[in-house]
Amino acid sequence: MNVKEKYELAKKEYEKWGIDVDKVLDELNKVKISIHCWQGDDVKGFEVVQNELSGGIQCNGNYPGAARNAEELRKDLDKALSLIPGKHKVNLHAIYLETNGEFVDRDEIKPEHFANWVKWAKENGLGLDFNPTIFSHPKSADGLTLSHPDKEIRDFWIRHSIASRKIGEYFGKELGQTCLTNIWIPDGYKDIPSDRLGPRRRLKESLDEIFKVQIDKKYNLDCVESKVFGIGAEAYTVGSNEFYLNYAAKNNIMSLMDTGHYHPTEVVSDKLSAMLLFDEKVALHVSRPVRWDSDHVVVYDDELKEIAKEIVRNDALDRVIIGLDFFDASINRIAAWTIGSRNMIKALLNAMLTPNDKLRELQEEGNFTERLALMEEFKTYPMGDIWNYYCEKNNVPVGESWIKEVKEYEKDVLSKRN
């Protein structure tokens, strides 16, 4: 049997539960994943003066072929996107600017420094998201930025953040797709602080200054991202979960939840329904924390599937902005993008092929036996045949056949880079 014939057979299994598989694939095709550019060069960026990676972030490995400039990074993204079904967005950090060899400090970045990214996105029908890069810089060397006691340093990062929001607005206007601009800072202390309130007050005041500048939400949406701890900030993080949840709620901006930014016993899948009750939209950075915020490549595991189910069963595909955030320099970077992105989409498909209404009904009835039994039986339903057809329909490789393309690209392109 060919892919289409297997699909038609598998469809019948789901139709028994009232699931319209053709409609599911049409809906899935509307979902845009925000694919992070920084997997392609190990979070180095293209500033004229290169700074060492900091902010408690680590990218381990020395697999050959990392992109050395924006042109190479776009070429690598082109290859990865040709292996991922659907039309998506690309997420940029401020350090991925292009300045023709001129030094431009972070607080001086302008839309023109990202014109090539916009041109490329237009040509490929992509949207762009953005992030100020508030780490890996001399003015973040002591681990404090927007909460720094030194007003000059705070003001520098305030200017950078405002400039970043204006770039987000530029992306939205040029591409006709709303840009999400996300603020994350590494601020915190290695050991027990003697003042927890002061840095948080300064952070609040800095954010107030940043968001005082009015930008049309049609073009740019703002969000803030918390973290439980980082390397070098084990004892105290200024931008904690409680801080940002309150700040976002009070100021009518979005919260972004990174799956690696919580205590290891906490899961984002359990947080989504609470957020969706109170927030119009929620943003995600889907990662894979191994014992800490290690940013491993996203795999098709239980938590990823549960996150997708929470989005789908709560009818929130248009309310949850899904971004990826991982970086692994120990494996082929095109493969890393492909694996993580395909897994995220696969998890959404799995959620959409789940009899959510029936399972909800069983829970309301208190029929926990049948609920568990049905959940378990659906784990071996023929979703793989649906997935393969979805890939074929989107003109991307079916099954593991994409690996061959990555190997050829490595041989022809990546291996020739120093």
UniProtKB/Swiss-Prot annotation:
Binds 1 Mn(2+) ion per subunit. Its EC number is 5.3.1.14. Mn(2+) binds at residues 261, 293, 295. It is found in: Cytoplasm. It catalyses: L-rhamnopyranose = L-rhamnulose. Its cofactor is Mn(2+). Catalyzes the interconversion of L-rhamnose and L-rhamnulose. Pathway: Carbohydrate degradation; L-rhamnose degradation; glycerone phosphate from L-rhamnose: step 1/3. Belongs to the rhamnose isomerase family. It comes from Clostridium beijerinckii (strain ATCC 51743 / NCIMB 8052) (Clostridium acetobutylicum). This is L-rhamnose isomerase. One of its GO terms (cellular component) is cytoplasm.
